[in-house]
Amino acid sequence: MSSLSILHLLLLLLALHAPQAKGLPVVTSRTPYSMLMKEIMDDLKKITPSPEGSLNSDEKNFLTKESLLQANLKVFMTFATDTFGSDSKIMKNLKEFQPVLPTATPTEDPIFIENKNLGDFRMKLEEYLVIIRNYLKSKNIWFS
């Protein structure tokens, strides 16, 4: 056996006999936000009509404000719960974004989604997901 092989074996044995850290476990998995967004988009395409028209500048402005990211998420989650149910994949995936968005107290009202208008919901949520992706990337929270 070569000395390099013996060294590797000794390192392995040392690692196995090393004392275990006490306290919280080290989290090695990361939430795959890109996959969550893809699942939301795939579900939206299956269950909602293609959006007609486009967002006006005021709507885009409401979606991009960092102080409204959490409030806007709540609007999308409420619509998703009311429309698809609290156990829907869209709702569950949206909920995953709550811990990573800023919780600033908004000074303005969040985005408005027309009542029971799936096209409006889809159009605004698609834009919102792009904004969230950019926000997470800017904070180095984005995980593929």
Swiss-Prot record:
SUPFAM superfamilies: 4-helical cytokines. InterPro entries: 4_helix_cytokine-like_core, IL-3. GO terms for biological process: immune response; interleukin-3-mediated signaling pathway; positive regulation of biosynthetic process; positive regulation of cell population proliferation. The keyword Signal applies. Granulocyte/macrophage colony-stimulating factors are cytokines that act in hematopoiesis by controlling the production, differentiation, and function of 2 related white cell populations of the blood, the granulocytes and the monocytes-macrophages. This CSF induces granulocytes, macrophages, mast cells, stem cells, erythroid cells, eosinophils and megakaryocytes. Pfam families: IL3. Belongs to the IL-3 family. The keyword Lyase does not apply. It is found in: Secreted. Monomer. One of its GO terms (cellular component) is extracellular space. One of its GO terms (molecular function) is growth factor activity. Residues 1-17 form the signal peptide. Keywords: Cytokine, Growth factor, Secreted, Signal. It comes from the Eukaryota. This is Interleukin-3.
